[in-house]
Amino acid sequence: QEVEDLMPHRLLHNIDVVYIGDFPRELEDRNALYSNGGIYMTANEPTNFDMLENFVHEVAHSLESKYGMFIYTENLISEFKGKRERLGALLGARGYEISPHLYGFTEYNEKFDNFLANEVGYPTLLSLTMGLFVSPYGATSIQEYFANGFEKYYLENPRTVRDISPVLYRKIEEIINDDEA
């Protein structure tokens, strides 16, 4: 019921089923995944809010099939890359080194993800990305930038997304207000 109060039902059009349980093959090392009309979520989250965060995040990924060409335009890519460049400068100033061209990739890159998660670590990343990304995970790839912003828009404060990522905010607003959705 809580999800239906949060967002328009039409945004759930690509979701046929939600599975909650133990899915080591599907999830690998993730907490949740959207795939082929289904959302797979681990049952091992500590709180209901964590489950809700996972669900809303995966709803965002489900919207990519319909809205991908609209979402991932040059202006959003430019906003994301600019933030990545600033993150690179912040990390470099603190002695964290990785190939500079990895900051320019918009798609998921396992080497870059491992660098952020394991070498830098999310506690450090959290302090460095405040005001730059709505959360550290949004720095992972442009798809996570979108899904993370969507999640924060619905579960925290849309104004935070607007203030930190104005292009992303406008994309989310336009999807929400799309009568064709």
Locations of regions flagged by a protein language model:
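Alpha-helical hydrophobic/aromatic positions enriched in membrane-embedded helices and signal peptides
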Residues: F49-D50, P136
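Charged mid-protein connector segments
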Residues: L33-M41, E53-N54, E58-S62
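Pan-zinc metallopeptidase signature
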Residues: N109-A181
